[in-house]
């Protein structure tokens, strides 16, 4: 009799595993192999027909892959029995499960057993089985029969064949392209899955409007660090640090990468002091030596006051500042009056505490400071992030052990395509989201501007069609009513997803997507040296549906999209150069092309044969890369933008006029890597910003100036509203996963008990939460973990669709916020709202 997955048995096993982990590592930390008493023993990935219990594994087939329950891309091993995924465990050969520093990962590593302690995955990774076998998954293409696209209207879905769906969608796309309106196609993509082929499709089709999820996530942080030190995502070397200062980041629960809880807790165990600045006592703050409760949106003021003390008392790293930075004098003059007393009035933090924190941070070596969405999701978030990033510069805290590391994420290489003449014409059209107005904008676009323009009938033209891949803007973009109004203005909305999301409910066509356990991807992991992991199908698509990249390629074939050289891209293997009929084989050829062109230099088949199906550069982490001299052979092909003997002269791979990329700078008379900023150094003052204006037309300050955020409490709306994420769920995606709902079934509104008492409220009350933009109900939870001036919700709940289990659980915060973006970066402002809270009257 064939094996059939039993969800009830699986749930008991999952809860038992999580419970075991919680006893030793905190309720929602990462789950390590040692939780099942496997410890450092081997985890063979070959089929195990005899059931070698000494390795802690059942009989069956173990297939390595990479998780996609969130953007962390952890390595996983999947136990497959008769074509059914029965269990998911960590992949001990993948650094992304263990550490971002090579010396830590390789200590005790063997190709036979992997890393010494065993890797980890989080609760979501374990629950990936239920994401695959969710009974509410979409199974067949659907076409809308009801022209009414308002929320709550019955779409009157008609089931159609895949051929009909693709033919009709291709016909609508062809009509746009043939009429010279290819730019009126909008495209939204999740940014960790098959993004290259989507970008290729949009380019060959002729639309400049390819956008990704990142502008909902961390583009403010990327803008801050890129402006300061030329890298969008420096990585914290916690495990070697002695002082860790975090602004608005919860890495032990809101796990961006599953190695974070391990390296942070190991650092604390080894004597590091941990300080967390946050309005909410997060799980990380609860484990810290000190929680600094701050008013939302005032992180920049605190950072400037810390800098004031460090400079005033001459505690900064003078040799580093003199050699590797510019603009220090301007910056020092700016912070001269940014005293702890000044910041104390703004942040609510006592001046004496600010003085002490500054001295601790500057005198404890090595020190690491970092910030994520806490500061970044406010309208002043980019400048706050710059002020925080410059604290690291003051103490020489970049690319040295125990500091913020310059990542070396060389992996597979995306081969840029040249469009044909037809596409080239419409690609010259401006982006509909007006990205060019955002001086520190990101290639992912500006979702908020896009939806606001569409809803209000503004923008450079009127889009006609949107393809939305694994995105649910009705839940994830601030301003639900604005998003709904915008979507209703489209002639055609196509959604590709595994679930009937709130956005899919408004679509004209819904195509079933694949779960990550059914498809391919290459994942260039976010560690400090080059690593590429493989996501590969461990089971066949449950409903016979094509993977998303196959759907896109099938549309490309129907449209006959060609490159500028006349090659029909989606029919000819990018590596082999020969026609490939099978869509899966064509995509495998594309992945091999990217691997061969990138750091691994191997094919997909060769990657599959490596331990854990992960390529790891054995050279490991390099420190002080900014001081590395450019090799003579490379320098011979480069060009200088000035005198090669003059400090500050830039070195480019080709002339700047031809789009040359900066690869180095002359510093100390030597051609070194430096920092990839306009000056080649860390920039306390980004002087090039002085000529820029933000999206509102306001001049941009070259210094990390503090200004209050746009939305402030008023007598009518007196409370700040914040949100956060936890390891129990992924954004708005997992609330139909019954295993994860066993851990976190809803999201009550958290309020300080003193605030509740003042408002005549009590724990358990049903309350209204109202802002100038919307109103919603919530269940009240009182806790001293919340700042008295603030209320907050875990983001992701409050679904009206997605599935039978998700619907009606908890509260969505998106309806309470304006559809506004940071005027510098385009970051969605998920924390920019103030509310009033009052008891819901029972009727």
Predicted regions and their residues:
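Short beta-alpha connecting loops at secondary-structure transitions
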Residues: 289-294, 531-541
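Flexible, glycine/charged-enriched surface loops at secondary-structure junctions
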Residues: 180-184, 316-321, 368, 399-406, ...
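Active-site phosphate/pyrophosphate-binding segments
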Residues: 306, 326-447
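N-terminal export/assembly segments and adjacent metallocofactor-ligating motifs
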Residues: 2-315, 337, 350, 554-555, ...
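Extended redox/cofactor-interaction regions of prokaryotic respiratory oxidoreductases
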Residues: 2-7, 198-264, 270-272, 277, ...
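Long, contiguous, secondary-structure-rich segments that constitute the structural scaffold
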Residues: 548-610, 732-750, 754-843
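N-terminal leader/propeptide and maturation segments of large enzyme subunits in energy/redox metabolism
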Residues: 137-164, 315-351, 538-676, 743-745, ...
